[in-house]
Amino acid sequence: GAELRKLHGWRIDAFGSGDAGPLAVVEDGRLRRFRDWPEAPLHAAAASLGDAAGWPVVDIVTSHAGARARSLDALVAAGAQGIVIAGTGNGSVHQELEQAARGAIAAGVPVRRASRCLLGGVVGAPADALPSAGTLTPVQARIEMMLDLLAATAA
């Protein structure tokens, strides 16, 4: 499932599921399951991925103290077809970067905000907030957006 994360670069126990908890454990040589194995539905666009050169251009921009609009504006000007903002905490986006994101959306470029935090994702938001990636990491949100864009062009 989407909750599984690689937590360490080289340890044998490099993976974890954070707040979701374990799926199972091995006790006395036997597997003890706590819940069913997650099965993600196949995204409609996954079957027609083709060559990576034809994939939509979706970039990740990091929000931080003092973030400027120029990086997001430059990506949109260069032809980005989607933007994911890796926000602080609960997906917070610096004010100047948020204005640029709203400009991108107005120009037809989808934008999603995700959290840079390892666990928790983006929960709750005021009605005027930028669209949320939910519990997806910025990298997962980028892949989802690419698949959404591919599906939209195939339809």
Feature roles, as predicted:
Residues G91, Q95-A155:
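ATP/nucleoside-binding phosphotransfer catalytic cores, i.e., glycine-rich phosphate-binding loops
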Residues G1-G82, T88-N90:
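Accessory alpha-helical/coil subdomains and C-terminal extensions
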